[in-house]
């Protein structure tokens, strides 16, 4: 939660700097966002490489539960595609690109800003932060009315880090491994799906 608020604070600060012309306009035309993206991808790779225990724990998973991240991805993209039908100013592929962030707001918003512009990038940032917040605050409700796998699916890419504690508390310790596996797979899919969906239009 704290990390999400910090990200939003920087967004607001940047908006104010741009609105009052405190930063030269040429600054936004630089390749700074591209280099930031490269740095972020490097950090993602380090985090995966530094945690071999996570990869080993996947072997003990129930084979049927391995389909959960696939269902999360398909369900999210299907819902975004339907939402795009009712949005006259946005294509379904735009909406799907935003949804393909799966709560990974830092990476997806940079990708989308780079490919589609700052407006859609901002929408991606806010919508993916909201997904994380909903998973954090709504986990008890989701478990009560939709089952113990519900907060894992809603958490998207965040279930192996920020939302893991609340999922463990609400769903039980037996769901820790599937939560980590789910977050790992969905997290890994983000750069590929976002890039692909930004490159097409329908």
Predicted regions span which residues?
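Juxtamembrane helix-boundary/capping and inter-helix hinge elements in multi-pass membrane proteins
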Residues: 1, 22, 48-55, 61-65, ...
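Helical membrane-embedded segments and adjacent short helical loop/helix-boundary regions
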Residues: 1-76, 92-103
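Small-residue-rich transmembrane alpha-helices that serve as helix-helix interface/gating elements
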Residues: 37-39, 183-190
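Hydrophobic transmembrane alpha-helices of multi-pass small-molecule transporters
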Residues: 38, 135-136, 163, 191
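Entry/N-cap segments of selected transmembrane alpha helices
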Residues: 52-80, 121-133, 178-186
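Transmembrane alpha-helices that form the ion-translocation and gating core
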Residues: 66-112, 130-146
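Alpha-helical membrane segments and immediately flanking helix-loop junctions
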Residues: 93-133, 148-181
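Juxtamembrane boundary at the C-terminal end of a transmembrane helix
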Residues: 192-202
């Amino acid at each position: 939660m704290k990390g999400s608020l910090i990200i939003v604070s920087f967004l607001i600060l940047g908006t104010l700097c741009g609105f009052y012309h405190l930063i030269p306009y040429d600054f936004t035309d630089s390749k700074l966002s591209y280099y930031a993206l490269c740095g972020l991808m490097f950090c993602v790779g380090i985090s995966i490489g530094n945690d071999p225990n996570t990869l080993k724990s996947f072997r003990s998973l129930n084979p049927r539960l391995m389909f959960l991240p696939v269902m999360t991805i398909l369900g999210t993209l299907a819902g975004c595609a339907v939402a795009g039908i009712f949005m006259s100013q946005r294509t379904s592929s735009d909406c799907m690109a935003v949804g393909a962030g799966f709560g990974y707001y830092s990476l997806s918003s940079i990708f989308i800003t780079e490919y589609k512009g700052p407006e859609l990038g901002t929408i991606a940032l806010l919508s993916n932060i909201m997904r994380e917040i909903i998973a954090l605050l709504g986990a008890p409700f989701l478990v009560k009315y939709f089952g113990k796998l519900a907060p894992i699916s809603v958490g998207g890419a965040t279930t192996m880090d920020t939302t893991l504690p609340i999922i463990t508390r609400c769903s039980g310790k037996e769901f820790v491994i599937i939560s980590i596996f789910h977050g790992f797979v969905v997290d890994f899919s983000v750069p590929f799906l976002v890039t692909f969906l930004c490159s097409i239009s329908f």
